[in-house]
Design a protein with these regions (language model features):
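Stable alpha-helical elements in mature extracytoplasmic
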Residues: 54, 133-145, 179, 212-216, ...
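Surface-exposed patches in mature extracellular/periplasmic domains of secreted proteins
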Residues: 72, 151-157, 192-198, 228-232, ...
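Flexible glycine/proline-enriched surface loops and loop-helix/loop-strand junctions
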Residues: 121-123, 251-257, 286-288, 298-306, ...
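Structured C-terminal helix/loop/strand segments within mature extracytoplasmic catalytic/sensor domains
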Residues: 223, 259, 364-367, 374-496
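Active-site-proximal beta-strand/loop segments in catalytic clefts of secreted hydrolases
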Residues: 234-236, 245-247, 274, 294-297, ...
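Active-site SXXK
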Residues: 258-282, 293, 461
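Mid-domain, small-residue-enriched loop/turn segments at the edges of structured enzyme/sensor domains
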Residues: 306-394
Length: 496
């Protein structure tokens, strides 16, 4: 009887344990079933945990993060970019399908068994699937940001009453092409939702040539010069030019041009003709006379060169013919320099036939600021690019080497006055100056014609002045110096 009781107790105990196991398993199965309909605990989407969340809850969590505005910084400004403004949207169907596929990779009972034994599982991350409109983003950057926050650079401008220019200020400009991929990265990021926009600095624009002309006119007006003055400036890089004549401050219409006494600037045409006739193998005596003619302005050297290297009797006429071949029809030399030299020809030009403005031009030598400036431009082009009018007019007679020699001779004219006085020391100025005094020592005509080689660009500047009563040298020199300085400053405005 005792053994039967013990066996019965064991059976009942086993039955109870089995029943408890069934109950516990059933409870765990019910609990797991509830968990099974949600995403597995090891699942994340784009690094965002969505384990144990329903499909709707997972999408809401993603939307909460990816619908947050993106902060864009443009200098000190903060712009809030709503992702929907650029068409940003999650591809929820693809995301949920990928997550569901991951959930069902393991069978229900296998997953339940792992759950019962609390077996660790490897984390799984579903990549983000989203899109945006490149066109809408580009339009947003252009209309909402660039148009509002870009700052244009302010150009350098002449300072009234001075020879200087006010330095311009740089501007800022949104770099749209660089911004697009950077913003795309931020839109798709769960934790980096701000961006400093790339900005390009824009340099101030250079003042226009018209600004320079206005400044030159103001300088002349402030100087009080009440004679006739002609100005010519040629930009040797861009080909722009300034050309005007003022008579007692009043603009003189051209064409026809206004002629001036050429004085010693006529020695530039003489030099061109000499090189045309002597070729590259120049003798020592010719070199000395060229130096004396240009650097020392010795008139007898000019006569020697014309008589010995061009034509003994008609050298001035041949110089004039060379200028006419170049199209410089208002520039001529009608006689030698020595006292009592005869007038070889009376030249009638469109410029010296004007009656509305008079400069009492010398019948022996005349030119205009425009024509002597064009001749200097021809020499420059010949020396630098082996081209220009000199090559076209005198093929095989004038070479690049000869033109470079012409410029070197003109650089030797160092006087530290007029155009040269307006540029910094050490600046190469290839020029010829001149003035004429009457029998009483009074100056009526003053001129300077130059090629200026500056760091910011090379240019031609010619100035001719006439006054029927007197040109007082110091004020006239100051005027030319200021004009020269203003032009040099125009080409060499400091970088902000």
């Amino acid at each position: 009887m005792r053994n039967r009781g013990s066996l019965s107790f064991f059976r009942w105990g086993s039955l109870v344990l089995i029943l408890l196991a069934v109950v516990v398993t059933t409870l765990q199965l019910v609990r797991f079933s509830r968990l099974w309909i949600n995403f597995p605990s090891n699942l994340s989407i784009a690094g965002i945990p969505v384990g144990q969340l329903t499909r709707q809850q997972a999408i809401e969590r993603l939307l909460t993060i990816y619908s947050q505005p993106v902060e864009l910084y443009y200098n000190e400004a903060i712009i809030q970019l709503d992702p929907t403004a650029v068409g940003f949207a999650l591809d929820t169907d693809v995301i949920l399908a990928a997550a569901e596929q991951e959930r069902t990779l393991t069978s229900f009972w296998e997953a339940f068994w792992n759950y019962l034994w609390d077996r660790p599982v490897q984390p799984v991350d579903i990549p983000l699937r989203a899109s945006y409109s490149d066109d809408r983003l580009r339009a947003y950057l252009q209309t909402e940001i660039a148009s509002r926050y870009d700052q244009p650079a302010t150009p350098a401008l002449p300072i009234v009453g001075t020879t200087n220019f006010k330095v311009g200020t740089p501007g800022s400009e949104l770099d749209i092409e660089r911004s697009i991929p950077l913003i795309e990265t931020v839109l798709f990021s769960r934790n980096q939702r701000s961006l400093v926009l790339p900005i390009k600095k824009t340099s101030p624009s250079h003042p226009s040539f018209q600004n320079l002309e206005v400044l030159l006119r103001q300088i002349i007006d402030l100087s009080g010069f009440d004679g006739v003055i002609g100005i010519y400036v040629e930009d040797l890089q861009a080909g722009q030019d300034i050309n005007f004549i003022l008579d007692q401050g009043t603009h003189v219409a051209t064409p026809p041009d206004v002629v001036f006494s050429a004085s010693s600037t006529i020695k530039i045409p003489i030099m061109v003709s000499v090189f045309r006739h002597i070729g590259e193998n120049i003798d020592a005596e010719s070199v000395k006379n060229l130096e004396d003619m240009i650097a020392k302005s010795i008139n007898s050297a000019s006569d020697w060169l014309m008589q010995n290297k061009i034509d003994r009797d008609n050298g001035p006429i041949l110089v004039t013919e060379d200028m006419q071949t170049l199209g410089l029809n208002n520039t001529f030399l009608a006689g030698h320099f020595y006292p009592g030299a005869p007038l070889l020809h009376v030249y009638s030009t469109s410029a010296n036939q004007r009656t509305d403005v008079s400069t009492d031009p010398d019948p022996y030598s005349q030119t205009t600021p425009l024509e002597i400036g064009q001749l200097l431009q021809d020499i420059y082009q010949c020396a630098n690019i082996s081209g220009g009018s000199l090559f076209a007019a005198f093929p095989a007679e004038i070479t690049q080497t000869e033109c470079q020699s012409m410029i070197n001779y003109l650089i030797q004219d160092r006087i530290a006055l007029l155009i040269q006085a307006g540029v910094p020391d050490g600046t190469n100025v290839a020029h010829k100056h001149g003035w004429v005094t009457d029998m009483y020592g009074i100056i009526h005509d003053l001129s300077d014609a130059a090629i200026v080689f500056s760091p910011g660009g090379d240019y031609v500047f010619t100035v001719y002045m006439y006054h029927p009563v007197q040109i007082v040298f110091d004020p006239a020199n100051e005027l030319v110096k200021n004009l020269s300085r203003a032009i040099y400053n125009y080409y060499n405005i400091p970088t902000p």
